[in-house]
Amino acid sequence: MRIIRPKKLKVGDLVTVVSPSQPVASRRNFKRGIRTLESLGLEVIPSKNVEAVFGMYEAGTAQQRAADLNEAFANDEVKAIFMSGGGFLANKVLPLLDYELIRKNPKIIIGFSDGATLLNAIFAKTGLITFHGFSVEHFFKRSTPYTVDSFLKIVEEGGVEFRPRTNWRILKGGRATGRLLGGNLLSFVNLLGTSYCPDLRRSILFFEEHDDYSEDVENSLTRLINAEILAGDYVQGIIFGKLVNIGLGSNDPDTKQWKKPKGFTMYQILKRRFEPYQIPILANVDFGLINTSLTIPIGIEAVMDTTKHQTRPFLKLTQPAVR
């Protein structure tokens, strides 16, 4: 597959906002997020159905959501597409997208949470580099200098390095080169076995998860392991971001009677699940449902180095994600 790098974003560019999953939860926060984008010198025009509601938890019908995305890619004046928020059911949109249109009209598309469903599927179907970062509705909360700097360095300047803000944690040492794929863990594993899942050969996976229980996270990890992609020419390394608001245990009330083992943590779970695999594992990286989050491109090649000689874990793109 030919890799397509979108054009750099520039001050004065016209951008749009779509809602591929759940409806806008807070109109006030949504408007504040738009103002944050405007403060960066961008002209923002929301899509036609961005504030639509269908049923109890969808931002319009799947047809409406797909139409907004297809129209955004078809509009030559639009230079980037942002997602309003996350949620679920972006997967209903996947069969309705015009991937040939997207391939012929490449542009920046950035999202978070369930948006990872679209980001990985679009890369898988077209080769277009996409971007995992933030949602507009939450951007005003996450518009810290670190978040904004990371976003601008990747999409405007063509930066290739990721600067740690906190202490990244090495769970397993090693060095790997591969194509960055991932985003939200559950959204990604839901793509496994479908035509919307990217080719996982020579890949480095990166995951965030939030507002869940460790049992559910481990279930998603097990689905990943059972796909038999953690050996040979497939996954070369795994990066975990911040695991936010993950309750230890299960959401099943019948399990509340069971005592938590001493020292039981998410890090312990990650170490245990990936112990048999000889690939580097990095955790606590600065991305996820936090107010200081990196923008990470999906589909571009990167190098991760967690060997002992490194004073700090190292992550770098082999080339810019934009042109």
Listing of model-derived features with the role each one plays in the protein:
Residues V24, R28-N29, R175, R179-D212:
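Conserved beta-alpha junction segments in alpha/beta enzyme cores
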Residues N75-K79, Y234-V235:
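Short acidic/histidine-rich motifs immediately flanking catalytic phosphotransfer sites
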Residues A80-N91:
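N-terminal glycine-rich "phosphate-gripper" loop used for MgATP/nucleotide binding
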Residues L97-A121, I129-S135, P280:
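Short, acidic/small-residue loops that bind anionic groups at enzyme active sites
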Residues D199-T265:
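Internal helical hairpin/lid segments
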Residues K242-R323:
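ATP/nucleoside-binding phosphotransfer catalytic cores, i.e., glycine-rich phosphate-binding loops
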